[in-house]
Amino acid sequence: MLDITKNILDVARFLFGLNDQLKATERQRRADMAALFEDISNCLTATSGGIRAGAIPHGRCAELITYAQALPGVIYQEVGEARARELGDMLHSAYAVEQLAMRIAQSTDKESYLAQLEEASGKFRALANLIRVGL
């Protein structure tokens, strides 16, 4: 269950590593990718903040699933269909953020798991900003 945070971070790191490739795409595709990456970042930030405050991030599961389902359609031209599906599946495997919140709250490693979520959020946000402007 706690591999969820690692999966999310792995997706963010992989996509961030493709920054040059992603920002080379045409403007509308970059805008679509940036919007999705920013939405993912916002979801992760809200999830982490909720967990840190001792709350269960209700509704974030459905939100993250929606983004995971949209991801392959947004990045497949840049990474290939198989890899796009794999990344979408990895993000989708993290759907149980409400259960994650309950597990993390009881964990002695709570801060390290939250740090992974926050790092992933930061990478998604930075990538969104970089590809939006083509930098």
Question: In which residue ranges do the predicted regions lie?
Answer:
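Short, cationic, amphipathic peptide segments
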Residues: 1-23
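Long, amphipathic, charge-rich alpha-helical segments that form helical bundles/coiled-coils
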Residues: 71-114
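C-terminal amphipathic alpha-helix
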Residues: 105-135
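Short, charged, amphipathic alpha-helical segments
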Residues: 58-66, 88, 114-119
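Small-residue hotspots
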Residues: 34, 41, 48, 94-95, ...
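Amphipathic, membrane-active segments
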Residues: 16-70
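Mid-sequence acidic-hydrophobic segments that form the walls
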Residues: 11, 15-18, 97, 104, ...
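Long, hydrophobic, amphipathic alpha-helical segments used as structural scaffolds
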Residues: 23, 41-44, 48-55, 76-86, ...
